[in-house]
From Swiss-Prot:
It comes from Escherichia coli (strain K12). The active site is at H63 (tele-phosphohistidine intermediate). This is Putative phosphotransferase IIA component SgcA. The gene is sgcA. The EIIA domain is phosphorylated by phospho-HPr on a histidyl residue. Then, it transfers the phosphoryl group to the EIIB domain. Keywords: Cytoplasm, Kinase, Phosphotransferase system, Sugar transport, Transferase, Transport. Coiled coil: none annotated. Gene3D superfamilies: Mannitol-specific EII, Chain A. GO terms for cellular component: cytoplasm; transmembrane transporter complex.
Amino acid sequence: MINDIKWVQAQRKATDWRQAVEIATRPLVAYGAAQPCYVNGIIENTLNWGPYYLIAPGIALPHARPEQGANYNQVSITTLRTPVAFGNEECDPVWLLLCVSATDANAHILTIQRISQFIDSPQRLTAVGNASTDDALFALVSG
């Protein structure tokens, strides 16, 4: 799902959902998959509509609309050292953020399908949560 270690971040520290989103989007912005305004789009959308991207207990899929700053299709994966609350009783606290930059609806759907297959394995998720370094996390999510 991830083809380069630059897209993974293991055991990062965030104090709240906003900081978690900012951290999770850093690779997307740093390597050009998204513009800085994309981060603001996710935060503004969350403030307006709530955390619409929480997909399972502990798992968030932060993303904004393509026109909010997506440059090309990419996923970044971030695990948090200490899970944070996003304000959703069913999914809080969140420890895994799969941040998506998608340029159109078709790309978004294909990415969601790949992520669904990825998170379908409890054993894989446990290993991802236990990965203590970027290298260890990349070994689990590459391919």
